[in-house]
Amino acid sequence: MPRTLRTAAERYLRAKALSRGTRNEYRSTLRKWDQWGHGAPIEKLQRRHVREFLDWVYERAVADHGTSPGRTANKAREHLRAVLSWAWEQ
């Protein structure tokens, strides 16, 4: 059964002892992933999917006049990296 990023992230958040603020940041990234809507199951994710998502996050932050769109995209990248690395080890 293909695993989605949301399923993997929920399991990751349950497995790790993270602060409430950190959990909320991860959930924010998941909401962005869902809004983006072009994700594939983890087993079929390619570099281009991640790159397109991060570009979308950056462009959205610029359009929303965010104070630091680069930081926003970097945080999303860090969250994806942590969840995907953890999921691939499971």
Predicted feature residues:
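Catalytic cores of transferase enzymes with a strong primary signal for eukaryotic protein kinases
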Residues: T7
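N-terminal core-binding DNA-recognition domain of tyrosine recombinases/integrases
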Residues: E10-G21, R27-Q90
